[in-house]
Amino acid sequence: MIDINLLEKLNAPTAQQRLDNLKAILADIDFPPTVPQYINNHIHTTYSFSPYSPTAAVFAARMEGLCTAGIIDHDSISGAREFLQAADLIGIPATIGMECRVSMDGTRVAGRRTNNPDQVGVSYMTIQSVPHHNIEKLEEFFKPYRAARNERSKKMVANINALLPGVKLDFDRDVLPLSLYSEGGGLTERHIMYSLALKLTAQTGKGAAMVQRLEDMGLTLSEKQKAQMMDTQYPFYEYDLLAILKSAFVPRIYVDADEECPSLKDLVKLCKEVDACLCYAYLGDVGDSVTGDKKAQKFEDDYLDELFLCLEEEGVRAVTYMPTRNTPEQLTRLRSLCDAHNMFQISGEDINSPRQSFVIKAMENPLFANLIDATWKLIDHEREGKALPI
């Protein structure tokens, strides 16, 4: 996490203010050397959910020694132009994209759980390496889907109010202002949980009182979580609380996504029209979570071979994955299937909380050199129109 005072300047209310503040900061900053292996193509910003504006995200990535940076937001690419301008000012190559959930109805894996912990029949996919002249076309396509998602979010807020009578959340007053929806940003379950975290903190305070409140709500906290709740001086206290609430309450208040999920057929067509790279985001079964932040759950591993046949049939030609999040056995199998089906492999590990590092240490392993090379292919495609291997 960058210095809190710098972050506040780089999170100023408007993009122009943020970029102007960046110019002033750059006059007095010394960046560490870049590391050729440090790439990350999946950095969230305030245009979905993150402590970082697009400008702050690029700055933070460069401060950690990344040699490239990539923006990915939920249902939105509205932060991309600011991200690119900040990258130009800092002098770091950048790639842009977004992610969304896709209905798998009509495919051979319809009705199955793939990479979505909350819902069967709906898969997460990323749209990578978007040519810059097509940003607005992509943004316009997702505008009605964002509106539909808001309607579902209102139902989940109502579910919270029914589940927790002492909490009265109002979508328009408490949740919507936490997002950049009015500027084309996406509103997610994390915004809802963050709103709940703010409400609980306002009602209860921090420290022992919060620990007791959560236990009274039926939550069993780990020692790590208790320590976080006792750290009343941490400037992002509500982010830690959000993580606790998300795990405990999203399964209880979740409403299935429907109208906000384009069909896979429509998304494949869109990506061809805008000349972007559509990627299936591999998750893999979670046993003992590599990162310790996911419960044990089955995902796509039992029928991964069939899923690859589905992707090939439907016109998806790339897979993105996170080496830090999977076991060596999962990665070996996945990479073999990518080779067998001629799938372009890319990588990025989602950044959406202040405790996360932007660095993917796994990239230091020569085994993943292809993922570094792929990142430069994404950048060259955006900048110069070079064809991707898809």
Annotate each language-model stretch with its function:
Residues 53-54, 260-264, 303-304, 330-331:
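Amphipathic coiled-coil/heptad-repeat helices and related helical stalk/stem segments
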Residues 271, 279-285, 293-320, 326, ...:
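Substrate-recognition/cap regions that form aromatic- and gly/pro-loop-enriched pockets
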Residues 1-30, 88-301, 377:
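Extended substrate/RNA-proximal surfaces in nucleic-acid metabolism proteins
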Residues 40-52, 289-302:
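Active-site mouth loops of central-metabolism enzymes
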Residues 33-187, 314, 320-379:
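A metal-dependent hydrolase metal-coordination microenvironment
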